[in-house]
């Protein structure tokens, strides 16, 4: 049974969202810790992307601020790894398919495991590509 499944077991889950790197990575790390202390069951971390088509203006602007502040996928992985030393609840990345493919699917999942990410949400994943990405996620124990 995955950690994400356990977060929902016999209850509703409180799942706050934060855009990684907005306003900066240190603040994001502190927010992750505070979210768990405030009672979060699972945390969703948005990976900043230059074209977040599935997002409204608030998250689009947060992504732009994070990118302007120098947030990269590698830096976000490193920050989550640091936060994971204190945050024990499941954490998932909300990302787009382009960053996953650009980074490399296998490499991306390996980094997710190394930093303690439990799953990913990919809102623009084409149905035709779901099985392929699902297989890679499954091989690394990452929920999709």
Label each region the model flagged.
Residues 1-17, 81-85:
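N-terminal amphipathic alpha-helix/helix-capping segment at the start of soluble metabolic enzymes
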Residues 10-15, 86-96, 137-144:
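Short beta-strand/loop segments at the ligand-binding rim of alpha/beta enzyme cores
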Residues 14-28, 92-104:
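Active-site mouth loops of central-metabolism enzymes
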Residues 15, 41-44, 121:
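Conserved beta-strand positions in the central sheet of alpha/beta enzyme cores
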Residues 16, 35, 46, 112:
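Conserved, mostly hydrophobic/aromatic
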Residues 23, 40-72, 99, 127-130:
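Glycine-rich, proline-tolerant flexible connector loops at the mouths of alpha/beta enzymes
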Residues 60-115:
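Glycine/small-residue-rich loop that forms an oxyanion/phosphate-binding "nest" at active or ligand-binding sites
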Residues 68-71, 116-129, 141-144:
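Catalytic beta/alpha-barrel core
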């Amino acid at each position: 049974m995955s950690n994400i499944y356990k977060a929902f077991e016999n209850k509703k889950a409180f799942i706050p969202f934060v855009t990684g790197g907005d306003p900066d990575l240190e603040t994001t790390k502190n927010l992750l810790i505070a979210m768990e202390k405030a009672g979060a069951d699972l945390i969703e971390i948005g990976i900043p992307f230059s074209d977040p088509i599935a997002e409204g203006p608030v998250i689009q602007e947060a992504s732009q601020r994070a990118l302007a502040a120098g947030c990269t996928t590698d830096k976000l992985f490193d920050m989550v790894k640091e936060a994971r030393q204190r945050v024990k609840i499941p954490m998932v990345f909300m990302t787009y398919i382009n960053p996953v493919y650009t980074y490399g699917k296998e490499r991306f999942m390996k980094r997710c495991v190394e930093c303690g990410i439990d799953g990913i949400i990919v809102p623009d994943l084409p149905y035709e590509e779901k099985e392929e990405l699902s297989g890679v996620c499954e091989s690394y124990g990452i929920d999709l």
